[in-house]
Amino acid sequence: MTINNGTLQVPGANIHYQVRGSGPIILLVHGGGGDADKFHHVANHLANWYTVVTYDRRGHSRSNLANQIEGYRVETHSDDAHRLLAKITNKPAYVFGSSSGAVIGLDLCIRHPEQVHVMIPHEPILLQLLHGNELKQAEQFMEDLKKNHRSEVIKLMSRLETDEQSKAVLTKRLLGNSTYFTEYEIQGILSYTLDFEALKTVFTSSPMKILPAGGSASRELFPYRCANALAEQLETEWVEFPGNHTGYTMYHKEFSERLHDMLEKEKKHTC
């Protein structure tokens, strides 16, 4: 598999991105604590049908910030995605976003609907869609995640079977992503309010499609409920994928086939 690497300079950051495959463009937007490599295996499968674009969001791995203490804003990350798509293509693209990446994708839909053909927000972290005890539990989960994420990364790395030099490099990279996630992104994503009226307006007045999605193993968890509630708000189709919140890391082939089948079905509906 040939993977072409590139760098895009955007205001305040250099964005590292990767392109593989051929066919219609699909942009994959990772969640908190990850980077382009989170999608490595699923991107390789998708490259059988698509030109797959992955990237390290600003503040992650190879996408360096000009200001290391820059605050996190969904709108800034959305603008990065807009600029990256504009560099790659002048046509509407498929966009898949996971977790906080799904929120970034939805913000992109509001600001640049002309760039998005189909948006798949997979378990978006949108606590504004939750109420009562469900909301309280989600808030507590995010607080616990903020406290424990770094130690979980260290545990994960301790179980990794690779040489010590490679492990040291990867540990430094993932801990850097974890620091950005816990110190900036969690608060930023929780402070963000999605403009549902604006989203509904572009959803109903443009050819763009939004297909919220959740993992079949996540049904009892709040991100799944966020995706389900989003589908209810938009009165649109609801899609289920294999696995949990990060099912694409465990079920590469099944996940990519589900995504491809879904997009093929959508293409037939619009023909």
From Swiss-Prot:
Chain coiled-coil ranges: none
A Pfam entry, by short name: Abhydrolase_1
Record-level Gene Ontology MF annotations: triacylglycerol lipase activity
InterPro entries according to UniProt: AB_hydrolase, AB_hydrolase_1, AB_hydrolase_fold
Residue ranges annotated for the AB hydrolase-1 domain, each copy included: 24-124
EC main group: hydrolase
Family from the record: Belongs to the AB hydrolase superfamily.
Name used for this protein in its record: Uncharacterized hydrolase YraK
Lineage: Bacteria, Bacillati, Bacillota, Bacilli, Bacillales
Gene: yraK
